[in-house]
Amino acid sequence: MTQKMVSRIICFLMGYALGNFMTAEVVTRRLTGRPCAELGKTGNPGMANVMRSLGMKAGIAVLTGDILKTALSMLLAWLVFGTGLGRLSMFYAGLGAVVGHDFPVWLKMGRGGKGVTCCCTLLIVFSPWGLLACILGMITVFVTKYLCIGGIVIPAAFLIPAFAVFGPEIGLLTVVLTGLCFCKHWPAAKEIASGRCEKTDVLNMLRKRRRQ
């Protein structure tokens, strides 16, 4: 195993370790004394479920924590391994944070979140193309009101620039990221046709917040 391969693995594990910090779990237990698994209809330890169940401030706290843990993992990887790996170090760490958030080891690799915030942070910190992908995902959510569709569109929209601009390795890592997001959101997406998938009117939530 080459030194650069070891560096890639370490970057991923750094991200995975930080990704295991479940901000939603901390916020929910702080405010309710209960685990996030008992919160709302889904029990998902993510911003959307916390915001729907506990309000805007709690949701923003979760959003902030998930952004910080992903960005911090990418920064640390860049500082330690950036000289040898360049921006690859950031992507491996960010991907590790997404996997850690989705499959936290302290929850026995289950009951993790869906990784939307971590995914967005990874893409935005990595490249302006990532910001465009996130904007496209946000527009999709505003139009459809389905968070699960946006969660799939965001990494999928980054696939073309990943291969065309950054090369095959980033492209393949983005395929992994897209597949991970697809697997996490597909169960909810399948319920759209039956009308059982919960809608989230983000714009309406923001309007109500401004009136308060």
PLM regions with names:
Residues 1-14, 72-92, 124-132, 162-173:
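Helix-coil boundary and interhelical linker segments in multi-pass alpha-helical membrane proteins
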Residues 24-27, 98-110, 138-144, 186-190:
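C-terminal ends of transmembrane helices
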Residues 35-44, 107-120, 146-154:
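Short, non-helical or kinked segments that cap or interrupt transmembrane helices
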Residues 12, 16, 62, 66, ...:
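Alpha-helical transmembrane segments of multi-pass membrane proteins, especially transporters
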Residues 2, 6-32:
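N-terminal signal-anchor transmembrane alpha helix
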Residues 26-57, 111-112, 190-212:
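Cytosolic, membrane-interface loops and tails of multi-pass inner-membrane proteins
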Residues 51-54, 77-81, 100, 114-145, ...:
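Interfacial segments of multi-pass membrane proteins
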Residues 46, 52-78:
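Multi-pass membrane catalytic core of lipid/isoprenoid biosynthesis enzymes
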